[in-house]
Each structure stands twice: as C-alpha cells, then as structure tokens.
Amino acid sequence: MMGGKSSKSKKNVEFGSPSTPVQIKINSEYTEHLSSYERACSEDPKLESFDSALHERTNRVINKLASGVEIKSLSFDSLREVTQCLLDMNQDVVKVILQDKEDIWNNQDLFSLVNLYFESTAKTMDFCSELENCLNRARRSQVIIQFAVNQFEEENEDKENRKYEKTLEELKRFKVAGEPFTKEFFALFDLVYKQQVMMLEELHKLKRKLDKRLRNIKTWRRVSNMVFVTAFVSVLIFSVVAAAVAAPPVVAAIAGALAVPVGSVGKWCNTLWTKYEKVVRGQKEIITSIRIGTYISVKEMDNISILVRKVEVEIESLLKKAEFAITEEKEVRLAIDEIKKKLDVFTETIEELGEHAGKYCSDVTKARTVILQRIIRYPAGSPKDEAPWTEMM
C-alpha cells in the first residue's frame, strides 16, 4: 500500500544525486496518520483500490523523474507526467466527495419537518381545548340526567301527586343540551389526525435518509484518508521535482512549506468526519423524539375516537328515553328505569374519555418540550443531558 511503503521508508527516503541529497523527514505525527491509513486500507476495499492506483501513478512519475535527476535535467514530458499525476489524484478524491455532496449541516428536510410538527401540535392544542369543552358539556348533561333521576325518586315517593313535573323539567333541560360533540370538534379531529398520519410518513422517509447518511460516514472516512495520502504523495513528488531543478536549500524550503498542510489535513478531515457523525446523530435524535410523540398521539386519538363514539351512542340513547318520557308523560317511570340502566355506563365512559383526553394533551405538551430540548442542544448536546422520553410520560 502507498501508506505502508511510505511509512516503511520513513527513516531514509532520498532522491537525487549523492552530491545533492534530498531527504523527506516523516515525523511521528505523519507516522500516526500513515499507520491509520494502512489500517483503513485493509478494512475498506474501495480505499485499497484507490491506494493501488495511487501507488502505481506515484511509482511511474518518480521513475520518470529519477532519470532526469541523474542528469540534473527535466524534460517537458517529465513535467507533464508530474502535472497529470497530481491532477488524476485530485480528481479521484473529488469524485468520491461528489458522490455525497449534500450539505449535512443545513438539512432543509429536517427544518421543514420540525416546523410542520410545531404547526401541527399547535392545531393539536386547539383540538385539546375543543375536546375539553365537549367533555364539559357531556359532564353537564350527565349532571342534569342524574338530577332528573334524583327528582324522579323524590316525586315518586309522593303517592298523591305523581305528575313528575320536576323530573320532566330536568329531562327537557337534558334534551336542550343535546349532543356535546360539535361539528367543530369533528372537523378539528379529522384535521389533526390526518396531519399526524402524514407526519409519521414524512418521518419515516427522513429517517431512511439519515440512516443512509450514517452509512455514508464510511465514505467520508475514506475521503479523509484519500485527502491525506494524496497530499502526502504530492510532497514526495514535488520534492523530487525540486531536487532535479534546484539547490538543496530550495528543496528544504518547498518541503517545509508543504509539511504544514500535510500535517494538518489529517486532523482537519478527521474533525470533518466527526462533526458529520455528530450532526447526523443529532438529527436522528430529533426525528426519534418527533416519531415517538407522533406515534403516541395517533394511538391516543384512536382511543379518543372510540370513546367519543361510545359517548355519542350512550347520550343518543338517553335523549331518546328523555324524549319518550316528555311526550308520553304516563310512561315517565318506564323511561327513568331505562335511563338508570344507561346512566352508569354513560358516566363511566365520560370519566374514561376524560382520562384519555388529559393524558393525550399532557403527552403533546411533553413531546413539544422534549423536542425543543433536543433542538436547543443540537448538534452539540448529548441525549444524556435530557430526561428520557419514557420518564417524561
């Protein structure tokens, strides 16, 4: 491998005639990078292929230059060979970079999705308010019908006057109260539910994109190695060229000037790769939070829908019984007996719906808080800094 041959010859790499020796000194920092490059080549077939091509090019150009060094003269063909070699090496690196040219630090998909989430949850909060209003109306209806039953018990004890006037009055109030769930409630329910389902679909698509980006971290690691070894080989080639056309002091100046970018490029690329991974994982943390919150929201809305329908069925039955009692005053006793049978189920359903509604609205609020925490910390924060989602439920 190019890295292997470079590191093995690090103690005495010389080009030029005996009277004008040129030596490239590879310090411990380069040794570390080259060793890392060797390991990467053994683990990555694509990088190993790049290394083989680079090795072949480098040998060809150095052999070409060696003949010029012996006579202290370089032909235009030799210089053209050098230029073409450097261009080819750089082009190989550029090709790899362009394969994944997306701007990872400005993820417009994520930005749009987070905005959509907060717009959606704002509508969800409106829905929660409307749901609470409907529940209050249902509770008032439950109180009225319970009071009507109590009135019936009192009036039924008066054997001389069993017209059940107060009972009928309460039943009329119950009838006037009507259905607790309005058209606005169902319109909001449909809107929010569709938004939540759409959100889950978009989250699934974005998660797959982010998973692909995490897999591409291997590509970026390959790029960083390519950039480093390309710059390193460029120093070797330029040093040979300098040996053929200049005095040793000039060679030393050229090699020294190039040593800084070569030494720093490995660190820079590694920093780039690390930042890439951190940013993508930060984006995945945000997406995971939104997915959990949205999934729970959809499930709770399914439960709420079932319970709302159950309340509707129960109250519709009670309204029919009340209507029967009002129109057929002689049948008040029969109507109240039927109402009593339905009342307990109606009350339990309202209580159950209230519990689900409270949990749902609480979950939405907590989900917004968790996601805001992640956005504030993104991409520098750590998931450990936050309360786990399960603890906040």
Swiss-Prot record:
Q: Give the UniProt subcellular location, in the record's own words.
A: Membrane
Gene Ontology cellular component annotations, sorted alphabetically? membrane; peroxisome
State what protein this is by name.
UPF0496 protein At2g18630
Question: Which Pfam families does this entry report, sorted A to Z?
Answer: DUF677
What family, per the record? Belongs to the UPF0496 family.
The way it spans or sits in the membrane comes to: Multi-pass membrane protein
> Can you name the source organism?
Arabidopsis thaliana (Mouse-ear cress)
Q: Which UniProt keywords apply?
A: Coiled coil, Membrane, Transmembrane, Transmembrane helix
User: Transmembrane residues, as ranges?
Assistant: 226-246, 249-269
Q: Which residues form a coiled coil?
A: 149-222, 299-356
Domain of life of the native organism: Eukaryota
Q: Where is this region: Disordered?
A: 1-20
